[in-house]
Regions:
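Short Pro-Gly-centered flexible turn/kink motifs
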Residues: 1-8, 80, 189, 194
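Extended, loop-rich substrate-binding clefts of extracytoplasmic carbohydrate-active enzymes
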Residues: 4, 9-73
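Histidine-centered catalytic micro-motifs
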Residues: 22, 93-101
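Hydrophobic residues positioned within well-ordered beta-strands of beta-sheet architectures
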Residues: 42-44, 65-67, 78, 94, ...
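Short coil/turn motifs at secondary-structure junctions
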Residues: 49-51, 74, 85-87, 103
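A short secondary-structure junction signal
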Residues: 55-58, 79-81, 91-95, 112, ...
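Short, well-ordered beta-strand segments enriched in hydrophobic/aromatic residues
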Residues: 69, 76-84
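Active-site/ligand-binding surface loops and adjacent short beta/alpha elements
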Residues: 89, 99-193
């Protein structure tokens, strides 16, 4: 990145890869917690700097990561903000593996479909690393943009994608949603870019 090389420990031996990022197992400090009439909010932060942690050893940037969770009657909102305190720009990627219990609105597993705001498939090599090539979506992955894939019938999706908004209820949507086809009950995981 900008002439700098980052070296991380191997965490997937069979692929000789590192995964899950530098903050996955780090302890965050609860900096705020509030319970109001209609909302519960918890804010956690992590400060990386040369004097206090091993993260800096592999990723030599001083930064602050703040994660805020808000629970209301409308749902759970998660906000992630990074503050770069370094003298240089730092590369950044954020990802979460959010588990969902299905069925969450009754019925059977086959009643649920998943839709994703995907654009193109990112080609991966034998080590599951991006090759730099982008491919058109396969027929199966094209369903993610349209009617959705049956959640329990598609198997694991071991692929990377570019982001392209989809239409949900007449509005642009960036993210993933799982919907119960009979009732219309949804769980949404939406991304907003700042």
């Amino acid at each position: 990145f900008e002439g700098r090389t980052y070296q991380y420990p191997i965490t997937i031996e069979r692929e000789r890869n590192y995964h899950h990022g530098v903050l996955k197992s780090e302890a965050f400090l609860v900096s705020k917690a509030r319970e109001m009439d209609r909302e519960v909010m918890i804010e956690c932060r992590y400060d990386a700097n040369a004097g206090n942690d091993a993260v800096y050893r592999d990723f030599p940037h001083e930064f602050k990561c703040k994660i805020t969770y808000r629970l209301t009657a409308e749902g759970l909102e998660q906000e992630v903000v990074f503050f770069n305190r370094s003298e240089t720009r730092m590369p950044l990627g954020v990802g979460f593996h959010t588990p969902l219990t299905i069925p969450f609105a009754g019925g059977i597993d086959a009643d649920y479909v998943m839709r994703l705001a995907v654009g193109e498939e990112v080609e991966l090599d034998g080590r599951n690393l991006p090759t730099g090539r982008r491919l058109p979506l396969s027929e199966q992955f094209s369903k993610l943009r349209r009617e959705g894939l049956q959640v329990t019938g598609c198997g694991p999706i071991e692929a990377g994608f570019t982001l392209r908004e989809i239409d949900v209820d007449g509005k642009p949507f960036r993210g993933a949603l799982v919907e119960h086809l009979r009732t219309g009950v949804r769980t949404c995981y939406e991304l907003s870019l700042i």
